């Protein structure tokens, strides 16, 4: 259910805007059934990735600070995760895989690039912010997980010849 809850109006607005911008074209291309499967695989892959990264980070913290965890003073594994952003990032990479040369233009700053380059930039930014811990409160590895699972599913469908069959 985490994919249907959001942290506020702007979180919901930007996810729905991206869902409309990129998801509608993706759905028209692969069909509604595959699109629904794609959306949930990317979303569930996002939370799986986020949970695994958090688990391993917790393990590293436990080794460094074993006394903190044993006394129950901290419990990071109960950090809530919410939003459809992981699935949305999966949709963005799916769109970029099917339409790599489409041009995306940002409003601020006014930059135009091909979809494949925007997605690559998103990956680098999410990886950097996730590893360095900048922009706290954002599940960067969930975004990357959504992209990874979306990429792998679309790659599987392409290679198996199932992408274009509705």
Q: Where is each model-derived feature located?
A:
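A detector for small-residue-rich transmembrane helices and their helix-helix packing motifs
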Residues: 1-166
